[in-house]
Every structure is written in structure tokens, then in C-alpha cells.
């Protein structure tokens, strides 16, 4: 299938081949088409079109030489078939076209329907990142201690210890018999459960919530009573002006427990009434403060004259002390008072009977002190001043 655009001259065979330049270019064109056919790839139309034109030209020259164009041996097939500015066709269509940009080319066969071999097909894509495996995050199973604590709380049994996974120190919730005073003061499920059962009510009468045992093991209420479950009870110890609400003090029926527990060195909390308490014990026996006929726990300003009140205020301003938590704190009181307003509003006594035993079981932090503490909450009906009175008690 070799077509000659010109006739070979016998004297022109002085070149390297016995073909002219146009004949040699046509042979290369046909050989390239044969390579496409052998590799099974489709032949580009740019290679087939020059063959058709050359065939028509040769047939026209054979029939009518007048229609022949003048020969252009300098341009050849490059200008006639492929034209200028076109990209040169692949000389080896079945070979991988991967090169290094200069002279080297891959020697492997191209993958079917691709320009590159199997090795160089995906070389241009970014393969540095591995595919991310989307794993569903499952929550970790609850610990055995938390599960047991939840089951005990649902069954109505108080858990002894609840250990958390956080590095914070774990707190231990006290047993029901240890938590009875705190539950009565700060509220909670044990207070309601104790009121329903008769056995617990008997023990509740024995360990009254208003006789607060100060012990080194539980110097403060446990942190669990300040949790979100008992948020409505967290302010039971604060000053609430709600009529009839006594967080720290008992009603009139608890006076017997107060007198029974006075001999055991317990700290007692009672409802502060308006009745004066008659006693011949002076307010400050060691320093000689106060009047001997006055109440040791309250100062009735309506029964004293102006001279005694002025002298008492000066002495208390200079020498009144409060022994609280092992520290000697001096309480400074303002020099001026409204005597008329104070005379109309008698003070409410703060302290109950002091324990007079040396070896008392209610000693706090191993000390032999017999200090008592009592607090009052003002009612909504009356507007009474709250005054803290403290003294040293030297048992002889």
C-alpha cells in the first residue's frame, strides 16, 4: 500500500535510501498507522485524512494531468496532511507515555483505554493521605462502682462510697445513722424516710437533729448535700425571712431533749423565744462584766438605766472576745447605739445551758472547751435585732 507522489529517478538514488523525501515521509506515515492497528487503539483522523487526499490527488493526476497541482517537495506531508501548529502524534501509540520531561520514556505497554501503564496511571493524583476510616464513637460502658451506686440508690439503700473516674478526691457519703443530723438540717430523702418508719422515729428522738454533734470525722456537712438533687435545701442554714421556718431550732416539744442532752456536752440548738431566762450567774464571771441579776444569755435593756448601759457598752467595746475555732477574735462594736430603739426591742437570748462536765463526750477536736453556739433567724412578723453574745466559761 505504498503510494508514490513522484516517480523515482534512476540518477537520484545517491541518497541514503532509494526513496525521495516525500516517498520516505509517506512510508513513515503508513508505518505509524500500522502501529495503531497492531496495538488495537483507534487511529486518529489526522492520519487517515492525508491518505484520502493523496488517493484523490493521484487518481486525478492519472485521469487529467491538467488538474495536478505543482509539486511542493520542501513542505511535504507536514503542511498537506497534518498542518502547522498541530501536536505531533505519538510515534509509539501502544507504549506508556510517562516521561521524565527530557528523553526518558517508560518502556511498559500502556493500559487498555489509557495513555499510561498500570504503574503510572495514578501517579498524578495525591496519594499521600490515607483514606480516613469513619468509626462510630461508642460511649464507654459505665464503671462497676457507678453502676452499683445507681442500683443501690434506686433500691433505697444508701451507698457507702461512690468513686468517680476524675482525678478529684472522692467523697464518701455517710451512713443513714451518721447523716441523720445533716438530713434534718439540710433536708434530703433520709429525713422523709425517718419520719415514716417508727423505729427510725425512735432513733430520731434519741439523736435529735437539733442536738448537733460536732465531731472531727464530720466537721462540715458532706458535699453530697450541696448537690443539684438537694438544691432547694442548700440554703437551709442561711437567713430566710419565712414565717414559721426554723432551720436550726426546735419547737416547744423539743425542750426535754435539750435538757437531757445538756449533761452530755452536746451543742444544742433551740428556738429562741421572747421569754427571759432567770439566772443568777453573771454574764462574765471572770472579768466582772454585767449585772449579777441580769440574764447570762440576754441583756434586757428595758430594765437598766442609762449609766449601766453606757458602762456596759464601753467595757464590751474594749474587752469583749469571742473564742471561735481555736482563735481569739476581738469583736469591735460601734460606740453609738440607738437606746430608744433598743429599749423597745428586747434582745433574744442566744445560748442555752452550758455543759459543766470536764470529760464531756461532745468536745470538739479533742479540746476540753465547753463553748456553745446558737443562731437565730428573724421572723417576717417581728423585726428584732440579732446580737451575738459570747463569753468564756471557766469551770471550777
UniProtKB/Swiss-Prot annotation:
Record GO biological process: developmental process; DNA-templated transcription; regulation of DNA-templated transcription; response to deep water; response to gibberellin
Paired cysteines (S-S): none
Record keyword Transcription present: yes
Domain QLQ: 18-53
GO molecular function, one term: ATP binding
Comp. bias intervals (Low complexity): 144-174
Disordered: annotated span: 117-176
Pfam families associated with the record: QLQ, WRC
Domain of life, per lineage: Eukaryota
An example Gene Ontology CC term for this record: nucleus
Keywords, sorted A to Z: Activator, Nucleus, Transcription, Transcription regulation
Location in the cell: Nucleus
Motif (Bipartite nuclear localization signal): 86-105, 123-130
Residue ranges, compositional bias (Basic residues): 120-129
Entry comment describing in which tissues the protein is expressed: Highly expressed in the intercalary meristem of the internode and in the shoot apex. Detected in the leaf primordia and emerging leaves in the uppermost node. Preferentially localized in the epidermis and in the tissues surrounding vascular bundles of the intercalary meristem of the internode and in adventitious roots of the second highest node. Low expression in the coleoptile and in the youngest leaf.
SMART domains: QLQ
Residue stretches making up the WRC domain: 90-134
Induction annotation: By gibberellic acid (GA3) and submergence.
Family: Belongs to the GRF family.
Its biological purpose: Transcription activator that plays a regulatory role in gibberellin-induced stem elongation.
Domain notes: The QLQ domain and WRC domain may be involved in protein-protein interaction and DNA-binding, respectively.
Listed name of the protein: Growth-regulating factor 1
Organism in which the protein naturally occurs: Oryza sativa subsp. indica
Gene: GRF1
